[in-house]
Amino acid sequence: MCKYFIKIVSKSAKK
């Protein structure tokens, strides 16, 4: 669960 969240956040943070 957290893994997915982190993955999405990482993408957003890269923006």
UniProtKB/Swiss-Prot annotation:
Highest taxon above the source species: Eukaryota
Residues bearing PTM Lysine amide: K15
Residue ranges the record marks as coiled coil: none
A GO CC term attached to the entry: extracellular region
Signal sequence region: none
GO function terms (MF aspect): toxin activity
Protein localization: Secreted
UniProt KW keywords: Amidation, G-protein coupled receptor impairing toxin, Secreted, Toxin
Function: Anti-inflammatory peptide. By activating the G-protein coupled receptor formyl peptide receptor 2 (FPR2), this peptide markedly activates neutrophils, resulting in cytosolic calcium increase, superoxide anion production, and chemotactic cellular migration. In vivo, when tested on a auto-antibody-injected model, its administration strongly blocks the clinical phenotype of rheumatoid arthritis (RA). Mechanistically, this peptide inhibits inflammatory cytokine synthesis from the joints and neutrophil recruitment into the joint area.
Protein name: Scolopendrasin-9
Lineage: Eukaryota, Metazoa, Ecdysozoa, Arthropoda, Myriapoda
